[in-house]
Amino acid sequence: MVHRKATAGSDRIVGHLVLPGPLASGKAKVSVSLIDATMADQPASVVAKTEFVIENNTDNTIEFVLNAARCPTKRRWLFDATVTADEEGRLMPGDFVLTRSIVYVDPVRSADIVLDLERVT
């Protein structure tokens, strides 16, 4: 479920990461980014990023919140996400990563942002 709350010149995007199984350890670092990938001839730019630590998570769904500057419509938006046991964010076997790029035309008006992650082997 996505909730949109506009504040002075910004958008708040709430979504969920879905893991295919439990965390390998009791503690993990979560990183989620929103990337503007509109211009094919220019590098994609990170518009918003959030990082946080979860502990003793028994649920396979993790809620995330991104606070971005106002997201214009008619652009190509890409999400990037990782869940790692390493505090530095290095991927190891047993961690989770978003391997399929998911593009939205307007993420703040999308009905549902659910990102399915895959386990790193």
Language model feature labels by segment:
Residues L19-G21, D36, A85:
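Short solvent-exposed capping/turn motifs at the termini of beta-strands
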Residues G21-K27, C71-T73:
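A short beta-turn/strand-edge loop motif at beta-sheet boundaries
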Residues T82-L98:
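Short acidic/polar inter-strand loop motif in beta-rich domains
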Residues D11-P20:
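A short, amphipathic beta-strand motif
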Residues V2-A6, I102-T121:
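Extracellular beta-sheet/turn segments enriched in Thr/Pro/Gly and aliphatic residues
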Residues S45-E55, L98-V103:
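Solvent-exposed serine/threonine-rich low-complexity stretches and specific carbohydrate-binding patches
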Residues A48-R70:
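A beta-strand/beta-hairpin structural motif
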Residues T73-A85:
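A short, solvent-exposed beta-strand micro-motif common in secreted/extracellular proteins
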